[in-house]
């Protein structure tokens, strides 16, 4: 009965308004009130502040500053094996495994469309059909910066407006096509392991999604798909990120979905649904040995041009 009420509220509550309100409040400097809210949050969610660079809650001027708090370097050592892809975030594995054609597992008995997740971009979807995916849920207590699993050259970013359903075990089991319905930012990279997509999925009270190269992507929420393209490696203006480097963050939290091309990587065997993830630990292993100094493979210009022609979204300059 309680779960039915919670699910009904997902469709009734004004999620966009609540999200704007939460984002507004989280960005305000309110002195003792800010500290009180942070202290209550830490206590309720059992946040481990000893891992933070600034463990004293009084050192945060806003709730957002606290929420995206950086960790001390030594608490999340990075696996430096060039054949290992690292966890992009702290959290819990929601689902992972093989992409069956166009179908990605959302929860037991529930699939959603790869192409729908990628905003109907069928050429991008073709890169990942029958590939591998991993969905990581970031709970309120977790570190909310997202990092690179491997070295990568950014080739494309797409902002997809959408719903703002809460993302949790209950909604994953009961809201059809949850991740393909919610607001999200899709980032496509060239890597040593072929193309990789890292998708930041929004949710109720996720005030903003940011990337390190473009800053705040949302808000504003204008209701239109936006697309940015970026040059290949070695080109002027290329955005190159290293394994373990921060690539984005949530204010407040949600979900990261990673997509890998078929035949390129194998997920670490012990990982399963509800496995706890820690940034920098092994997520997957290359099918073929990769030398440490190999440059990321790139999507050809012909493929990139064909994709742009097939998906005439709202294009923006990368220097936005």
Curated annotation (Swiss-Prot):
Bilayer topology term: Peripheral membrane protein
Pathway assigned to this chain's UniProt record: Phospholipid metabolism; phosphatidylethanolamine biosynthesis; phosphatidylethanolamine from CDP-diacylglycerol: step 2/2
Superkingdom of this protein's organism: Bacteria
Free-text cofactor note: Binds 1 pyruvoyl group covalently per subunit.
EC number: 4.1.1.65
Keyword list, A-Z: Cell membrane, Decarboxylase, Lipid biosynthesis, Lipid metabolism, Lyase, Membrane, Phospholipid biosynthesis, Phospholipid metabolism, Pyruvate, Zymogen
PTM comment, free text: Is synthesized initially as an inactive proenzyme. Formation of the active enzyme involves a self-maturation process in which the active site pyruvoyl group is generated from an internal serine residue via an autocatalytic post-translational modification. Two non-identical subunits are generated from the proenzyme in this reaction, and the pyruvate is formed at the N-terminus of the alpha chain, which is derived from the carboxyl end of the proenzyme.
Active-site residues, Swiss-Prot/TrEMBL: 90, 147, 254
GO CC, one annotated term: plasma membrane
Needed cofactors: pyruvate
Site (Cleavage (non-hydrolytic)) location in chain: 253-254
Ranges for region Disordered: 301-320
Summary of the function given for this chain in its UniProt record: Catalyzes the formation of phosphatidylethanolamine (PtdEtn) from phosphatidylserine (PtdSer).
Protein name as annotated: Phosphatidylserine decarboxylase proenzyme
Organism: Cronobacter sakazakii (strain ATCC BAA-894)
Lineage of origin: Bacteria, Pseudomonadati, Pseudomonadota, Gammaproteobacteria, Enterobacterales
């Amino acid at each position: 009965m309680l779960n039915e009420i919670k699910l009904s509220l997902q469709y009734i509550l004004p999620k966009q308004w609540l999200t704007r309100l939460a984002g507004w409040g989280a960005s305000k400097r309110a002195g003792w009130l800010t500290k009180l809210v942070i202290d209550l949050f830490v206590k309720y969610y059992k946040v481990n502040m000893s891992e933070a660079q600034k463990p004293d809650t009084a050192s945060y001027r806003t709730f957002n500053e606290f929420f995206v708090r950086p960790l001390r370097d030594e608490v999340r050592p990075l696996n430096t094996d060039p054949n290992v892809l690292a966890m992009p975030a702290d959290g819990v594995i929601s689902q992972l495994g093989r992409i069956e054609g166009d179908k990605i597992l959302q929860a037991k008995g529930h699939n959603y469309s790869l192409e729908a997740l990628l905003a109907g971009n069928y050429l991008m979807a073709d890169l990942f059909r029958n590939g591998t995916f991993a969905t990581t849920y970031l709970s309120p207590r977790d570190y909310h910066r997202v990092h690179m699993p491997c070295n990568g050259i950014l080739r494309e970013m797409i902002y997809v407006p959408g719903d703002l359903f809460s993302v949790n075990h209950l909604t994953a089991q009961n809201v059809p096509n949850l991740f393909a319905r919610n607001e999200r930012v899709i980032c496509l990279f060239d890597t040593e392991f072929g193309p990789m997509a890292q998708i930041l999925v929004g949710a109720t009270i996720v005030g903003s999604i940011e990337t390190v190269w473009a800053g705040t992507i949302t808000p504003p929420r204008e209701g239109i798909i936006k697309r940015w393209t970026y040059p290949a490696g070695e080109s002027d203006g290329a955005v190159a990120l290293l394994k373990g480097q921060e690539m984005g963050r949530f204010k407040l939290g949600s979900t990261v979905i990673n997509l890998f091309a078929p035949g390129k990587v194998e997920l670490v065997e012990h990982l399963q649904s509800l496995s706890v993830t820690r940034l920098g630990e092994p997520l997957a292993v290359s099918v073929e040995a990769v030398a440490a100094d190999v440059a990321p493979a790139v999507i050809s210009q012909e493929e990139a041009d064909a994709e742009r022609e097939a998906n005439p979204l709202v294009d923006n300059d990368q220097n936005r």
